[in-house]
UniProtKB/Swiss-Prot annotation:
One of its GO terms (molecular function) is magnesium ion binding. GO terms for cellular component: cytosol. The keyword Cell membrane does not apply. Gene3D superfamilies: 3.40.50.20, ATP-grasp fold, A domain, ATP-grasp fold, B domain. It catalyses: N(1)-(5-phospho-beta-D-ribosyl)glycinamide + formate + ATP = N(2)-formyl-N(1)-(5-phospho-beta-D-ribosyl)glycinamide + ADP + phosphate + H(+). It comes from Pseudomonas putida (strain W619). InterPro entries: ATP-grasp, ATP-grasp_carboxylate-amine, ATP_grasp_subdomain_1, PreATP-grasp_dom_sf, PurT, PurT/PurK_preATP-grasp, PurT_C. It comes from the Bacteria. Mg(2+) binds at E267, E279. This is Formate-dependent phosphoribosylglycinamide formyltransferase. Homodimer. Belongs to the PurK/PurT family.
């Protein structure tokens, strides 16, 4: 039976969030609604989730000693990673010492890099994936590309938001794609994955919740990426019954293997009735921001319920919905957003501004949300709203 105490008192139920971006911010808001005391940790001050947490710490989360010190001082009931770039070996140690890591320390460790999760899916679970090789040197990479064939995709094994990811169409792309992957890795230069390109009809995120009552699948989320980074998403994505059933089978297999409770973002490629596993995040997914307007319980509310052991009897989806990112480029520590009245002038629209303290280059600073009679209309409405927002540096 779940019992939640009073924040900032001896009975408080404490959650420590590792990573404080826009997704973490929404998770904190949902935990706050349930009376949970939230401690936010990230590598820079005033990160979005810190702005709505009870208190925060600035720590390099790849520094296991520093991360452990904060966790031991705060004594949280739940440790909730919101990003991949964490000292996962320390989380494994802490879990073995009795701390509760969401969903599990193993899940955060396996999904921190593409190699762990790809080998689990393809080699242990025998799930359909694109052909792939890993390489540490340019020579091995060139051989792998020759083996996989063109077109193919190269990615650092450790990166996020599409950093370092590119499509190779011929030998002319070989050197520049290698260089780009080496620049884009989260830990600097290093290992890459080379994947055969799947000529898919569309790609989806199947948001999958492991909770006290079992596993719940949300309506599939379609999305459009540029350079591996999400630009817009919509729900529900139309699929054949056979493809949907196969997507749920793949999602169940991989989330069961990772274990624990929480929401997972399972990324899949779909062509006709065929489905291929791509990646999984053991946490809310950026494409799932659409659920802030498309469902009675957003992915963030569902994650909070699952973490706390609360039931999820039903999730109601409100019909065709879409999200479109606000993605300016510039430099500022005092960004402002104008023309919001025009952006919100149509019915069934909403805006989330993330409150990121600075921008240096191109950065996702907010998202516009919309519902309408069709997916096409919802996408167009969300895009109109996003384009109406004026970003001032």
């Amino acid at each position: 039976m779940t019992r939640i105490g009073t924040p900032l008192s001896p009975t408080a139920t404490r959650v420590l969030l590792c990573g404080c971006g826009e997704l973490g911010k929404e998770v904190v808001i949902e935990l706050q609604r349930l009376g949970v005391e939230v401690i936010a940790v990230d590598r820079y001050a005033n990160a979005p989730a810190m702005q709505v947490a009870h208190r925060s710490h600035v720590v390099n989360m790849l520094d296991g000693v520093a991360l452990r010190a904060v966790i031991e001082a705060e004594k949280p009931h739940y440790i909730v990673p919101e990003i991949e770039a964490i000292a996962t070996a320390t989380l494994v140690e802490l879990e073995n010492e009795g701390f509760n890591v969401v969903p599990t320390a193993r899940a955060t460790q396996l999904t921190m890099n593409r190699e762990g999760i790809r080998r689990l899916a393809a080699e242990e679970l025998d799930l359909p994936t694109s052909p792939y090789h890993f390489a540490d040197t340019f020579e091995d990479y060139a051989k792998a590309v020759a083996d996989v064939g063109y077109p193919c995709v190269v990615k650092p094994v450790m990166s996020s938001s599409g950093k370092g990811q590119s499509l190779l169409r011929s030998d002319a792309d070989l050197q520049k794609s290698w260089d780009y992957a080496q620049e884009g890795g989260r830990a600097g230069k290093g290992r890459v994955i080379i994947e055969g390109f799947i000529d898919f009809d569309y790609e989806i995120t199947l948001l999958t919740v492991r909770h006290v009552g079992g596993t719940t699948y949300l309506e599939p989320v379609g999305h459009r990426q540029e350079k591996g980074d999400y630009q817009e998403s919509w729900q529900p994505q139309a699929m054949s019954p056979k493809a949907l059933a196969e997507s749920q089978r793949v999602a169940k297999a991989v989330t069961d293997a990772l274990g624990g409770r929480g929401l997972f973002g399972v990324e899949l490629f779909v062509k006709g009735d065929q489905v291929w596993f791509s990646e999984v995040s053991p946490r809310p997914h950026d494409t799932g921001l659409v659920t802030l307007i498309s469902q009675d319980l957003s992915q963030f509310a569902l994650h909070a319920r699952a973490i706390l052991g609360l039931p999820i009897p039903v999730v109601r989806q409100f019909g065709p919905s879409a999200s479109a990112v606000i993605l300016p480029e510039g430099q500022s520590q005092q960004t402002s957003f104008a023309n919001l009245g025009a952006a919100l002038s149509e019915p069934d629209t909403a805006i989330r501004l993330f409150g990121k303290p600075e921008i240096n280059g191109q950065r996702r600073m907010g998202v516009c949300l919309a519902r309408d009679e069709s997916i096409e209309a919802a996408r167009a409405k969300a895009t109109r709203a996003a384009q109406a927002v004026k970003v001032e540096f």
